[in-house]
Regions:
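Active-site anion-handling motifs in enzyme catalytic cores
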Residues: 1-385
Length: 385
Protein backbone atom coordinates (compact mmCIF):
# COMPACT_ATOMS: atom_id res chain seq x y z
CA UNK A 1 0.00 0.00 0.00
CA UNK A 2 1.35 3.43 -0.93
CA UNK A 3 0.28 6.99 -0.23
CA UNK A 4 -1.14 9.01 -3.10
CA UNK A 5 0.57 12.39 -3.59
CA UNK A 6 -1.84 14.93 -5.06
CA UNK A 7 -1.04 18.42 -6.31
CA UNK A 8 -3.96 20.86 -6.31
CA UNK A 9 -3.59 23.54 -8.99
CA UNK A 10 -5.47 26.82 -9.23
CA UNK A 11 -6.65 27.29 -5.63
CA UNK A 12 -5.85 30.73 -4.25
CA UNK A 13 -5.30 31.01 -0.48
CA UNK A 14 -6.91 34.47 -0.62
CA UNK A 15 -10.26 33.45 -2.16
CA UNK A 16 -12.99 31.86 -0.04
CA UNK A 17 -14.63 30.22 -3.06
CA UNK A 18 -11.31 28.55 -3.91
CA UNK A 19 -10.80 27.48 -0.30
CA UNK A 20 -14.30 25.96 -0.28
CA UNK A 21 -13.22 23.84 -3.26
CA UNK A 22 -10.13 22.79 -1.29
CA UNK A 23 -12.33 21.90 1.71
CA UNK A 24 -14.64 19.88 -0.55
CA UNK A 25 -11.67 17.99 -2.04
CA UNK A 26 -10.19 17.21 1.38
CA UNK A 27 -13.55 16.10 2.80
CA UNK A 28 -14.20 13.72 -0.10
CA UNK A 29 -10.69 12.19 -0.01
CA UNK A 30 -10.91 11.73 3.78
CA UNK A 31 -13.87 9.41 3.07
CA UNK A 32 -12.44 7.50 0.09
CA UNK A 33 -8.61 7.71 0.17
CA UNK A 34 -7.82 8.98 3.67
CA UNK A 35 -4.07 8.47 3.32
CA UNK A 36 -3.70 10.93 0.42
CA UNK A 37 -1.28 13.85 0.79
CA UNK A 38 -2.03 17.21 -0.81
CA UNK A 39 0.33 19.90 -2.05
CA UNK A 40 -0.09 23.50 -3.20
CA UNK A 41 2.47 26.05 -4.47
CA UNK A 42 5.05 27.23 -1.92
CA UNK A 43 3.80 30.78 -2.61
CA UNK A 44 0.94 30.00 -0.20
CA UNK A 45 1.39 31.64 3.23
CA UNK A 46 3.00 29.07 5.53
CA UNK A 47 0.35 29.47 8.24
CA UNK A 48 -2.45 28.71 5.75
CA UNK A 49 -0.58 25.70 4.39
CA UNK A 50 -0.04 24.39 7.93
CA UNK A 51 -3.69 25.03 8.84
CA UNK A 52 -4.84 22.78 5.99
CA UNK A 53 -2.01 20.24 6.44
CA UNK A 54 -0.63 20.73 2.92
CA UNK A 55 2.75 19.97 1.38
CA UNK A 56 4.31 22.51 -0.99
CA UNK A 57 5.33 22.35 -4.65
CA UNK A 58 7.10 24.65 -7.07
CA UNK A 59 4.45 26.97 -8.62
CA UNK A 60 3.41 25.79 -12.08
CA UNK A 61 2.55 29.28 -13.33
CA UNK A 62 6.05 30.71 -12.99
CA UNK A 63 7.51 31.69 -16.36
CA UNK A 64 11.00 31.08 -17.75
CA UNK A 65 13.17 28.06 -16.92
CA UNK A 66 11.26 25.32 -15.08
CA UNK A 67 13.12 25.28 -11.77
CA UNK A 68 10.82 22.59 -10.37
CA UNK A 69 13.09 19.98 -11.97
CA UNK A 70 15.96 21.18 -9.78
CA UNK A 71 13.97 19.90 -6.80
CA UNK A 72 14.64 16.37 -8.07
CA UNK A 73 18.31 16.86 -7.14
CA UNK A 74 17.36 17.05 -3.45
CA UNK A 75 17.12 13.58 -1.82
CA UNK A 76 13.51 12.38 -1.54
CA UNK A 77 13.81 11.74 2.21
CA UNK A 78 14.88 15.34 2.77
CA UNK A 79 12.05 16.62 0.54
CA UNK A 80 9.50 14.68 2.57
CA UNK A 81 11.03 15.90 5.81
CA UNK A 82 10.51 19.54 4.86
CA UNK A 83 7.07 18.89 3.34
CA UNK A 84 8.05 19.46 -0.30
CA UNK A 85 6.96 17.50 -3.38
CA UNK A 86 9.00 17.49 -6.59
CA UNK A 87 7.22 16.76 -9.90
CA UNK A 88 8.33 13.11 -9.78
CA UNK A 89 6.73 12.69 -6.32
CA UNK A 90 3.29 13.68 -7.60
CA UNK A 91 0.85 10.94 -8.64
CA UNK A 92 -2.21 13.09 -9.38
CA UNK A 93 -2.82 16.68 -10.45
CA UNK A 94 -6.27 18.08 -9.70
CA UNK A 95 -6.97 21.45 -11.31
CA UNK A 96 -9.60 23.30 -9.25
CA UNK A 97 -9.25 26.75 -10.82
CA UNK A 98 -12.99 27.45 -11.03
CA UNK A 99 -12.70 29.95 -13.89
CA UNK A 100 -9.20 30.63 -15.22
CA UNK A 101 -8.89 29.32 -18.78
CA UNK A 102 -10.38 31.16 -21.72
CA UNK A 103 -9.97 34.36 -23.74
CA UNK A 104 -10.73 36.58 -20.72
CA UNK A 105 -7.63 35.23 -18.93
CA UNK A 106 -5.28 34.99 -21.90
CA UNK A 107 -2.92 32.43 -23.37
CA UNK A 108 -0.11 32.67 -20.81
CA UNK A 109 -2.14 31.36 -17.87
CA UNK A 110 -3.46 28.44 -19.95
CA UNK A 111 0.03 27.55 -21.19
CA UNK A 112 1.81 27.86 -17.85
CA UNK A 113 -0.73 25.84 -15.92
CA UNK A 114 -2.87 23.35 -17.86
CA UNK A 115 -0.70 22.97 -20.97
CA UNK A 116 2.48 22.62 -18.88
CA UNK A 117 0.88 19.84 -16.83
CA UNK A 118 -0.39 18.11 -19.99
CA UNK A 119 2.86 18.28 -21.96
CA UNK A 120 5.66 18.33 -19.34
CA UNK A 121 4.30 16.21 -16.50
CA UNK A 122 1.52 13.88 -17.65
CA UNK A 123 2.54 10.29 -18.44
CA UNK A 124 0.81 6.91 -18.46
CA UNK A 125 1.84 6.45 -14.82
CA UNK A 126 0.11 9.51 -13.37
CA UNK A 127 -3.36 11.07 -13.46
CA UNK A 128 -4.53 14.52 -14.54
CA UNK A 129 -8.08 15.66 -13.71
CA UNK A 130 -9.67 19.04 -14.43
CA UNK A 131 -12.36 19.39 -11.75
CA UNK A 132 -15.65 21.20 -12.58
CA UNK A 133 -15.03 24.74 -13.78
CA UNK A 134 -16.10 27.32 -16.35
CA UNK A 135 -13.98 27.12 -19.52
CA UNK A 136 -13.56 29.14 -22.72
CA UNK A 137 -14.17 30.73 -25.08
CA UNK A 138 -11.01 29.84 -27.04
CA UNK A 139 -11.23 32.29 -29.97
CA UNK A 140 -8.06 34.35 -29.41
CA UNK A 141 -4.85 33.38 -31.28
CA UNK A 142 -3.26 30.21 -29.90
CA UNK A 143 -6.02 29.48 -27.38
CA UNK A 144 -7.76 26.66 -29.27
CA UNK A 145 -4.57 24.76 -30.14
CA UNK A 146 -3.32 25.16 -26.55
CA UNK A 147 -6.50 23.75 -25.02
CA UNK A 148 -6.57 20.91 -27.57
CA UNK A 149 -3.28 19.71 -26.01
CA UNK A 150 -5.05 19.54 -22.65
CA UNK A 151 -8.00 17.67 -24.17
CA UNK A 152 -5.57 15.15 -25.61
CA UNK A 153 -3.74 14.44 -22.34
CA UNK A 154 -6.14 14.92 -19.40
CA UNK A 155 -7.75 11.77 -18.02
CA UNK A 156 -10.95 13.61 -17.12
CA UNK A 157 -12.20 17.16 -17.78
CA UNK A 158 -15.34 18.39 -16.02
CA UNK A 159 -17.04 21.54 -17.28
CA UNK A 160 -19.46 23.35 -15.01
CA UNK A 161 -22.04 24.70 -17.44
CA UNK A 162 -23.54 24.26 -20.90
CA UNK A 163 -21.83 27.35 -22.36
CA UNK A 164 -18.42 25.98 -21.32
CA UNK A 165 -19.36 22.62 -22.81
CA UNK A 166 -20.14 24.32 -26.13
CA UNK A 167 -16.73 26.06 -26.07
CA UNK A 168 -14.97 22.73 -25.43
CA UNK A 169 -17.04 20.75 -27.94
CA UNK A 170 -16.28 23.42 -30.54
CA UNK A 171 -12.69 22.14 -30.36
CA UNK A 172 -13.44 18.42 -30.10
CA UNK A 173 -17.07 17.31 -30.26
CA UNK A 174 -16.41 13.62 -29.61
CA UNK A 175 -14.01 13.75 -26.66
CA UNK A 176 -14.68 10.76 -24.37
CA UNK A 177 -12.99 12.43 -21.36
CA UNK A 178 -15.27 15.52 -21.04
CA UNK A 179 -18.23 15.63 -18.61
CA UNK A 180 -20.83 18.25 -17.65
CA UNK A 181 -20.75 18.45 -13.83
CA UNK A 182 -21.72 21.25 -11.40
CA UNK A 183 -19.59 23.10 -8.89
CA UNK A 184 -18.83 20.54 -6.18
CA UNK A 185 -18.89 22.83 -3.13
CA UNK A 186 -22.62 22.00 -3.05
CA UNK A 187 -21.69 18.87 -1.06
CA UNK A 188 -20.30 20.85 1.88
CA UNK A 189 -22.72 21.39 4.79
CA UNK A 190 -20.85 23.26 7.55
CA UNK A 191 -22.48 23.90 10.92
CA UNK A 192 -23.25 27.47 11.97
CA UNK A 193 -21.26 28.36 15.11
CA UNK A 194 -23.38 28.97 18.21
CA UNK A 195 -22.10 32.57 18.46
CA UNK A 196 -23.78 33.39 15.13
CA UNK A 197 -27.23 31.91 15.83
CA UNK A 198 -28.85 35.36 15.66
CA UNK A 199 -27.99 35.78 11.94
CA UNK A 200 -30.35 32.91 11.10
CA UNK A 201 -33.14 34.12 8.81
CA UNK A 202 -31.34 37.30 7.72
CA UNK A 203 -31.47 38.72 4.20
CA UNK A 204 -27.93 39.01 2.81
CA UNK A 205 -26.37 41.28 0.18
CA UNK A 206 -23.14 39.73 -1.15
CA UNK A 207 -21.17 42.26 -3.28
CA UNK A 208 -18.32 41.57 -5.70
CA UNK A 209 -15.61 44.06 -6.67
CA UNK A 210 -15.36 42.35 -10.09
CA UNK A 211 -18.76 43.82 -10.92
CA UNK A 212 -17.22 47.30 -11.14
CA UNK A 213 -13.66 46.88 -12.48
CA UNK A 214 -12.10 50.20 -13.52
CA UNK A 215 -15.30 51.61 -15.03
CA UNK A 216 -16.76 54.45 -12.93
CA UNK A 217 -20.11 54.41 -14.75
CA UNK A 218 -20.46 50.67 -14.12
CA UNK A 219 -19.48 51.19 -10.48
CA UNK A 220 -22.21 53.82 -10.11
CA UNK A 221 -24.81 51.53 -11.71
CA UNK A 222 -23.82 48.59 -9.50
CA UNK A 223 -23.93 50.70 -6.33
CA UNK A 224 -27.32 52.06 -7.42
CA UNK A 225 -28.56 48.46 -7.73
CA UNK A 226 -27.21 47.55 -4.28
CA UNK A 227 -28.91 50.68 -2.84
CA UNK A 228 -32.16 49.63 -4.50
CA UNK A 229 -31.81 46.11 -3.06
CA UNK A 230 -30.98 47.42 0.43
CA UNK A 231 -34.02 49.73 0.40
CA UNK A 232 -36.43 47.14 -0.92
CA UNK A 233 -35.24 44.22 1.21
CA UNK A 234 -34.84 46.40 4.29
CA UNK A 235 -38.49 47.45 3.98
CA UNK A 236 -39.56 43.86 4.75
CA UNK A 237 -38.52 44.36 8.37
CA UNK A 238 -36.15 41.38 8.29
CA UNK A 239 -32.60 41.61 9.52
CA UNK A 240 -30.50 42.87 6.58
CA UNK A 241 -26.73 42.43 6.36
CA UNK A 242 -23.87 42.89 3.91
CA UNK A 243 -21.75 39.76 3.73
CA UNK A 244 -18.11 40.17 2.67
CA UNK A 245 -17.31 36.96 0.76
CA UNK A 246 -13.83 38.01 -0.42
CA UNK A 247 -11.09 40.49 0.56
CA UNK A 248 -10.44 44.20 0.58
CA UNK A 249 -12.22 45.05 -2.68
CA UNK A 250 -15.53 43.65 -1.43
CA UNK A 251 -14.94 45.31 1.95
CA UNK A 252 -14.48 48.69 0.25
CA UNK A 253 -17.73 48.21 -1.67
CA UNK A 254 -19.54 47.46 1.59
CA UNK A 255 -18.15 50.65 3.18
CA UNK A 256 -18.98 52.70 0.09
CA UNK A 257 -22.54 51.37 -0.02
CA UNK A 258 -23.09 52.01 3.69
CA UNK A 259 -21.92 55.62 3.25
CA UNK A 260 -24.74 56.10 0.71
CA UNK A 261 -27.53 54.62 2.84
CA UNK A 262 -29.66 56.69 5.22
CA UNK A 263 -29.11 53.96 7.81
CA UNK A 264 -25.90 51.85 7.49
CA UNK A 265 -26.50 48.10 7.57
CA UNK A 266 -24.63 45.42 9.47
CA UNK A 267 -21.50 43.95 7.83
CA UNK A 268 -20.71 40.25 8.33
CA UNK A 269 -17.04 39.55 7.61
CA UNK A 270 -15.90 36.11 8.77
CA UNK A 271 -12.38 34.92 7.84
CA UNK A 272 -13.41 31.24 7.63
CA UNK A 273 -14.86 30.09 4.28
CA UNK A 274 -16.86 27.36 6.05
CA UNK A 275 -18.38 29.80 8.55
CA UNK A 276 -19.20 32.17 5.67
CA UNK A 277 -20.93 29.29 3.83
CA UNK A 278 -22.83 28.33 6.98
CA UNK A 279 -24.15 31.91 7.42
CA UNK A 280 -25.42 31.93 3.83
CA UNK A 281 -27.02 28.52 4.28
CA UNK A 282 -29.31 29.75 7.09
CA UNK A 283 -30.33 33.01 5.38
CA UNK A 284 -33.94 33.86 4.47
CA UNK A 285 -32.85 35.12 1.03
CA UNK A 286 -29.73 36.53 -0.66
CA UNK A 287 -28.74 38.90 -3.44
CA UNK A 288 -25.37 37.60 -4.58
CA UNK A 289 -22.64 38.76 -6.96
CA UNK A 290 -20.22 36.09 -5.68
CA UNK A 291 -20.46 32.77 -7.49
CA UNK A 292 -19.70 30.55 -4.50
CA UNK A 293 -21.96 32.74 -2.36
CA UNK A 294 -24.71 31.93 -4.84
CA UNK A 295 -23.92 28.18 -4.77
CA UNK A 296 -23.91 28.22 -0.95
CA UNK A 297 -27.40 29.75 -0.97
CA UNK A 298 -29.00 27.70 -3.75
CA UNK A 299 -27.55 24.40 -2.49
CA UNK A 300 -29.21 25.13 0.88
CA UNK A 301 -32.53 26.00 -0.87
CA UNK A 302 -32.19 29.70 0.05
CA UNK A 303 -33.96 31.80 -2.63
CA UNK A 304 -31.48 34.15 -4.29
CA UNK A 305 -31.12 36.85 -6.89
CA UNK A 306 -27.95 36.57 -9.00
CA UNK A 307 -26.20 39.71 -10.22
CA UNK A 308 -23.02 38.46 -11.88
CA UNK A 309 -20.25 39.43 -14.27
CA UNK A 310 -19.97 36.30 -16.47
CA UNK A 311 -22.21 33.68 -18.08
CA UNK A 312 -21.62 31.32 -15.14
CA UNK A 313 -24.20 33.13 -12.98
CA UNK A 314 -27.02 32.76 -15.52
CA UNK A 315 -26.04 29.14 -16.08
CA UNK A 316 -26.22 28.22 -12.40
CA UNK A 317 -29.56 30.01 -12.02
CA UNK A 318 -30.88 27.91 -14.92
CA UNK A 319 -29.52 24.74 -13.25
CA UNK A 320 -31.53 25.56 -10.11
CA UNK A 321 -34.66 26.61 -12.02
CA UNK A 322 -34.38 30.29 -11.02
CA UNK A 323 -33.49 32.09 -14.25
CA UNK A 324 -36.31 34.56 -13.47
CA UNK A 325 -34.22 35.75 -10.49
CA UNK A 326 -31.19 36.71 -12.59
CA UNK A 327 -30.47 40.46 -12.73
CA UNK A 328 -29.20 42.27 -15.80
CA UNK A 329 -27.62 45.46 -14.46
CA UNK A 330 -28.32 47.28 -17.72
CA UNK A 331 -32.07 46.69 -17.37
CA UNK A 332 -32.86 48.99 -14.44
CA UNK A 333 -36.62 48.70 -14.96
CA UNK A 334 -36.38 45.00 -14.00
CA UNK A 335 -34.53 45.54 -10.70
CA UNK A 336 -37.53 46.12 -8.44
CA UNK A 337 -39.81 43.46 -9.98
CA UNK A 338 -37.00 40.88 -9.70
CA UNK A 339 -36.39 41.76 -6.03
CA UNK A 340 -40.14 41.51 -5.41
CA UNK A 341 -40.14 38.03 -6.99
CA UNK A 342 -37.27 37.08 -4.67
CA UNK A 343 -39.15 38.09 -1.52
CA UNK A 344 -42.29 36.32 -2.75
CA UNK A 345 -40.28 33.13 -3.36
CA UNK A 346 -38.67 33.39 0.08
CA UNK A 347 -42.15 33.41 1.70
CA UNK A 348 -43.50 30.64 -0.52
CA UNK A 349 -43.12 27.03 0.69
CA UNK A 350 -43.60 25.59 -2.81
CA UNK A 351 -40.83 27.80 -4.28
CA UNK A 352 -38.47 26.58 -1.54
CA UNK A 353 -39.51 22.97 -2.16
CA UNK A 354 -38.73 23.30 -5.88
CA UNK A 355 -35.36 24.84 -5.06
CA UNK A 356 -34.59 22.02 -2.61
CA UNK A 357 -35.47 19.47 -5.32
CA UNK A 358 -33.15 21.17 -7.84
CA UNK A 359 -30.41 21.30 -5.19
CA UNK A 360 -30.76 17.53 -4.62
CA UNK A 361 -30.39 16.93 -8.37
CA UNK A 362 -27.22 19.04 -8.45
CA UNK A 363 -25.78 17.15 -5.47
CA UNK A 364 -26.43 13.86 -7.30
CA UNK A 365 -24.39 15.15 -10.25
CA UNK A 366 -21.53 16.11 -7.90
CA UNK A 367 -21.67 12.65 -6.30
CA UNK A 368 -21.46 11.13 -9.80
CA UNK A 369 -18.40 13.28 -10.55
CA UNK A 370 -16.58 12.09 -7.42
CA UNK A 371 -17.57 8.46 -8.08
CA UNK A 372 -15.95 8.72 -11.50
CA UNK A 373 -12.83 10.44 -10.10
CA UNK A 374 -12.29 7.75 -7.44
CA UNK A 375 -12.97 4.91 -9.89
CA UNK A 376 -10.32 6.45 -12.16
CA UNK A 377 -7.81 6.80 -9.30
CA UNK A 378 -8.34 3.23 -8.08
CA UNK A 379 -7.93 1.92 -11.61
CA UNK A 380 -4.75 3.88 -12.27
CA UNK A 381 -3.27 3.68 -8.74
CA UNK A 382 -4.48 0.32 -7.34
CA UNK A 383 -1.75 0.37 -4.68
CA UNK A 384 -3.00 3.64 -3.12
CA UNK A 385 -4.58 3.82 0.33
Amino acid sequence: VSVLNIEIVGVSPHNKGALLMLEAIRERFSQHLPGARFAVPFTWPTDKRMHYGLYSTYPRDRGGFDKSRLCELVPRGFRQGVGFMAPSDIDVVLDASGFAYGDYWGLQKLQRRLVAVATNWKTDRNTFVVLPQALGPFKEPGMASAFEKVLGKADLICVRDKTSMQHVQGLAADKHNVRLRPDFTNLLHPELPERLREVQGAVLLIPNEKMVGQDQARRNTYLAFLRCAAAQLGATGRRLALLVHEGDGDRRLAVELNAMLPQPIEVLDEPSPLVTKAIIGVAHATVSSRFHGLISALAAAVPSVACGWTHKYQEVMADYGCIHLNIDLANQAAWQPTLQRLMAAAQHAEARRQLASAAADQRSLSEAMWAEVFALLRRRHPEAA
